C-alpha cells in the first residue's frame, strides 16, 4: 500500500495593506493526522459553522494578532481576533495528539494552547528555533514556500507582541484542491473548444484524410524502393553493345539530374575482377549524402583503379576507335564508355598521368628529369616531405651524383688498392673537382645542403659517436658484401672522401679535433705505400688525419705489415 502524501495548504497574506504574498505550508498528516486535518479544514472552510462560536470555521479574513520579533507570529482567532476565541472542527477543544516533532527552526507551525489538551484553532509560526516549547505544544507543519514573507512579518513585530502594521489573511485553502480545480477548468475548456471546432462528421473526415495521407506515403515509399532497386542493381552484360548502351544511359541520367542546378548525385562503384563489365552500385544517396560522396576515397578508388585499369582499356578501345584525339581526351572518353560514376580527382589524375607507381603522394624529383616509369615504390619518397632526417635512397643518390667519365667507365675508388695519379684528387680536395660536379643544377640550395648533410646519417653517427668505430675489422674481411653493395649503387664515394667532403663543407667540430692525433703518435708508413698513396696532407686540412690513419698499434686489429692502409669503406 502506497504511502499517502502529506497535504499542502496556502495562506495569502497582506502586510500593512501591501499586495498579497503567499505562504505554502506542508501538514505532517503522517505524524499528527488529527491536528493536521483540523488545520486543513480550517484553511478550506469545508467544516461549515462552529457550534460554540456560531461563526464559519475558516481562517479567511482573520489576522495575526500577536507578532513578537525573534520569536513567533500567532493567529487563527477567527471569532474574536485577539487570542481569546476560536474553535476546532471537532467542536470546542481537543487533546494533544503527540510531541514527536520538535520546534527546531524557522517556519515550524505549532498549536497554541492555554494548557495541556486545550487545542482549538489558534496556531503560531516560529521565526527561529525554540527548544523550550518541545513537549508543551504539538508541532503539525512547516513552511515550504514563502519564507521571505515570514521574515517580513517578523519586521513588523514588537516586544509586547502588538504588530506595527496589520498582518491579515486575505485567502487560504489547500493547494491540491486548487490544482485539481484548475485542471478541471482546463479540461472543460478543451472539451468545449474541441466540440466547437469538430463535429462528428468533421472527425470522420479528418480520419479519412489521415488514412489517405498514410496510403499515399506508403505508395511513394514503394515507388522509391522500386526505382532505387532497379537503378542500383542493374548490371551490364558482357557484350560491347550492352556496355555502350549503358554508358549512354548513365551519361544521360547524370546530365538530367544536374540540369536543375542542384548537387549532382554521385554513386561510388565497385568492379569485380572476374567479369568484365559487371558493377554494383551502392544506390542513391540523399541530398545530404551527396557532398561526402564527392570526397575522394583513397581506399575504394585505389582498389577500383588497380583492378579495373586493364579492363578499362579493353572496353574503351571500341568506344574511341573512330575519334582521333590526344591522350587526355582518350582517357576522358574511356571514363564515359565504362560508365564510371565515381568522378573523384584521384581517378582522373591517375588516368591522365598513367603513373604505374601505387604511391599517390607527390614524389620528390632530385635533379633528374628522365626518371624511369618503373620505379620501385619503396625507393620513391612517398610523402615528399623535406625533413632533415629523411634518408635519400640509393637510386636517387646515384642518379644525382653520377657524372660521366671521359672513357665511359664508371669512376669507382676501391679500397686503397690500385691508386694512380688519376684518382689523386680524392685525397687533395675537400669538395668534388669541377669534372666531378653534378651535371644538372639542384632545384634549390637548401635541397643540396640537406642531401649533403643527410646523405649517410647512419655511417656518420656511427663513426663520430661510437667509440667502437676505431676498432673496425680489416677492410679485406668486409670487402665482399661491401663490394656487392657498391655494385648496386655505383655512385657511392669512398668513406674517407666523404669524410673530407663533410670536413671541408662544415665548421670543424671539437669532436674531430679531439680525435686527431699529434704528429709524433703517427705510425711510420712504408715507402711502397707512400708511392702508391701519394701526398697524404694538404695545407687546407690543417694537419688532421683520418681516423683510419690515426689508429694506434695497440688498438688496431690488423697485422703490422698492413698497419698504414687507408680503409675507404662505405
UniProtKB/Swiss-Prot annotation:
Residues 203-219, 323-339, 387-397, 437-467, 495-505 have a biased composition (Basic and acidic residues). It comes from the Eukaryota. It catalyses: [protein]-peptidylproline (omega=180) = [protein]-peptidylproline (omega=0). This is Peptidyl-prolyl cis-trans isomerase CYP63. It is an enzyme of class 5 (isomerase). Interacts with SNRNP35, RNU1, SCL28, SCL30, SR30 and SR34. The binding to SR34 is phosphorylation-dependent. It comes from Arabidopsis thaliana. It is found in: Nucleus, Nucleoplasm; Nucleus speckle. The keyword Manganese does not apply. Ubiquitous. Residues 262-292, 340-351, 468-490, 509-523 have a biased composition (Basic residues). Residues 229-238, 246-259, 297-309, 352-365, 546-555 have a biased composition (Low complexity). Belongs to the cyclophilin-type PPIase family. PPIases accelerate the folding of proteins. It catalyzes the cis-trans isomerization of proline imidic peptide bonds in oligopeptides. May be implicated in the folding, transport, and assembly of proteins. Probably involved in early steps of spliceosomal assembly. It holds the Pfam family Pro_isomerase. The keyword rRNA processing does not apply. GO terms for cellular component: nuclear speck.
Amino acid at each position: 500500500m502506497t504511502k499517502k502524501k502529506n497535504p499542502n495548504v496556502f495562506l495569502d497574506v497582506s502586510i500593512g495593506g501591501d499586495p498579497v504574498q503567499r505562504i505554502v505550508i506542508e501538514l505532517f498528516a503522517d505524524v499528527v493526522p488529527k491536528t493536521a486535518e483540523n488545520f486543513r479544514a480550517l484553511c478550506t472552510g469545508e467544516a461549515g459553522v462552529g457550534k460554540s462560536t456560531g461563526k464559519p470555521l475558516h481562517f479567511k479574513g482573520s489576522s495575526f494578532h500577536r507578532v513578537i520579533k525573534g520569536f513567533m507570529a500567532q493567529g487563527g482567532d477567527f471569532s474574536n481576533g485577539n487570542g481569546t476565541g476560536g474553535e476546532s472542527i471537532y467542536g470546542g477543544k481537543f487533546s494533544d495528539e503527540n510531541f514527536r516533532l520538535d520546534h527546531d527552526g524557522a517556519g515550524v507551525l505549532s498549536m497554541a494552547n492555554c494548557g495541556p489538551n486545550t487545542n482549538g484553532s489558534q496556531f503560531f509560526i516560529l521565526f527561529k528555533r525554540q527548544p523550550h516549547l518541545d513537549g508543551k505544544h504539538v508541532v503539525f507543519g512547516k513552511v515550504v514556500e514563502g519564507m521571505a514573507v515570514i521574515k517580513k512579518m517578523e519586521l513588523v513585530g514588537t516586544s509586547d507582541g502588538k504588530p506595527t502594521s496589520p498582518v491579515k489573511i486575505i485567502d487560504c485553502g489547500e493547494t491540491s484542491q486548487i490544482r485539481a480545480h484548475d485542471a478541471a477548468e482546463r479540461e472543460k475548456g478543451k472539451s468545449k473548444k474541441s466540440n466547437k471546432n469538430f463535429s462528428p462528421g468533421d472527425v470522420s473526415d479528418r480520419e479519412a484524410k489521415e488514412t489517405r495521407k498514410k496510403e499515399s506515403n506508403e505508395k511513394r515509399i514503394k515507388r522509391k524502393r522500386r526505382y532505387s532497386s532497379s537503378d542500383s542493381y542493374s548490371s551490364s552484360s558482357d557484350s560491347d553493345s550492352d556496355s555502350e548502351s549503358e554508358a549512354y544511359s548513365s551519361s544521360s541520367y547524370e546530365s538530367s539530374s544536374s540540369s536543375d542546378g542542384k548537387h549532382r548525385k554521385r554513386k561510388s562503384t565497385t568492379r569485380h575482377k572476374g567479369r568484365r563489365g559487371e558493377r554494383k552500385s551502392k544506390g542513391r544517396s540523399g541530398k545530404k549524402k551527396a557532398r561526402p560522396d564527392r570526397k575522394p576515397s583513397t581506399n575504394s578508388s585505389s582498389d577500383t583503379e588497380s583492378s579495373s585499369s586493364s579492363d578499362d582499356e579493353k572496353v574503351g578501345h571500341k568506344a574511341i576507335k573512330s575519334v582521333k584525339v590526344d591522350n587526355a581526351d582518350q582517357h576522358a572518353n574511356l571514363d564515359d564508355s565504362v560508365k564510371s560514376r565515381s568522378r573523384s580527382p584521384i581517378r582522373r589524375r591517375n588516368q591522365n598521368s598513367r603513373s604505374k607507381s601505387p604511391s599517390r603522394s607527390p614524389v620528390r624529383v632530385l635533379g633528374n628529369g628522365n626518371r624511369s616509369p618503373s620505379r620501385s615504390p619503396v625507393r620513391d619518397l612517398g610523402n615528399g616531405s623535406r625533413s632533415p632526417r629523411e634518408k635519400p635512397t640509393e637510386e636517387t643518390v646515384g642518379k644525382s651524383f653520377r657524372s660521366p667519365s671521359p672513357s665511359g667507365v664508371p669512376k669507382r675508388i676501391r679500397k686503397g688498392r690500385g691508386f694512380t695519379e688519376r684518382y689523386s684528387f680524392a685525397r687533395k680536395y675537400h669538395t668534388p673537382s669541377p669534372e666531378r660536379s653534378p651535371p644538372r643544377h639542384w632545384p634549390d640550395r637548401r635541397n643540396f645542403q640537406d642531401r649533403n648533410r643527410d646523405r649517410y646519417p647512419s655511417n656518420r653517427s656511427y663513426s663520430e659517436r661510437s667509440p667502437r668505430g676505431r676498432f673496425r675489422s680489416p677492410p679485406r674481411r668486409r670487402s665482399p658484401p661491401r663490394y656487392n653493395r657498391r655494385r648496386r649503387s655505383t655512385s657511392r664515394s669512398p668513406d674517407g672522401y666523404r669524410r673530407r667532403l663533410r670536413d671541408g663543407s662544415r665548421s670543424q667540430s671539437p669532436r674531430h679535433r679531439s680525435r686527431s692525433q699529434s704528429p709524433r703518435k703517427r705510425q711510420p708508413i712504408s715507402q711502397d705505400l707512400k708511392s702508391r698513396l701519394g701526398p697524404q696532407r694538404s695545407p687546407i686540412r690543417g694537419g688532421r688525419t683520418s681516423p683510419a690513419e690515426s689508429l694506434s698499434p695497440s688498438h688496431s686489429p690488423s697485422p703490422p705489415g698492413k698497419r698504414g692502409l687507408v680503409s675507404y669503406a662505405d
